[in-house]
Amino acid sequence: MNTSFTHPEFADHERVVFVNDKAAGLQAVIAVHNTQRGPAIGGCRMWPYENVDAALTDVLRLSRGMTYKNALAGFNSGGGKSVIIGDPRTAKTPALFRAMGAAIESLGGRYIVAEDSGTSPTDMAVIAETTTHVAGLESDSSNGDPSPSTALGVFLSIREAVSFRLGRSDLLGVRVHVQGLGKVGFELAKLLVSNGAVVNASDINDDNCRRASDELSIRIVSNDELLTGNCDVFAPCALGGVLNEWSIPTLNTSVIAGAANNQLLTQEDDLRLANAGILYCPDYLVNAGGVIDVYHRRQGNSQENTDAGVTAIADRLNSVLTEAQSRGISPAQVAQERAEDLIRGPQNDPIPTVAA
């Protein structure tokens, strides 16, 4: 196994913590990538990783992406992530999440956790029994689930990218392939259908497919058909690494914009997409709606602040796409430059809030 320092995904991470609590059945990795702008915020993913090295690879990549995501959103926060090795369908126990909370508490506030793939607001409530450094909890005004905000940000980004690339002012008849029908993917498909898009989708979970077919009347296809079929927009909303040297030559789309993190398997895949004439909208820009939701609720800000923050994603994307076009470089390069400039610069003033 690679050590943290020699791991190919290690990118000057500040802290990488391996957690092993046998009594609680917990094996986890917490990665704090950068706290230049403030405490690291990022979700806790639970997944049945094949081994610890796979978990380490994922958490290192995800935490770096959170640094960029939070910087572009203008937050006084850095990037971090945590992963629990285990099947979320069978391995969840209160003891496991309490142990995870204790591990997070030991970092002294450097990392603030929230839900992610495989975890829920209910799990965050158990984590909160042993740490105060948790966001995305249920309240009187919110169920704690940020996925609708994530889906809305992706939807607005798709609409913006379709306008930019295809010159369309609406989504009527636009063909969108949605990969993944979990909480975010389903909400995205729902928004797309309600705005006239023609949606095909795939998911490894048969129940998710049946629900989407029954409730949204969308066409369910195989993952291979989804990747290779002709469409206007491909929206990856499952796990990362789907855009790679093997899949990119098979894609038949004009735009890529989705909710999945780490959609590019390598940095070279951005160039492959550009050479293929495909407009790739950087994932950490497009899918920031969830962390925007979590951030504003933790700050005690109003729903209007969250709504304004999510809506601003489309404007930010347009700015990135316009600059990329004028400079003859990819949108991912522009987004990375902007994020790194923000990370190197002084911490922002507190985000202005909208009166409730």
Residue ranges and their predicted role:
Residues 206-285:
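Rossmann-like adenosine-cofactor binding region
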Residues 162, 254-355:
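Adenosine-phosphate binding glycine-rich loop
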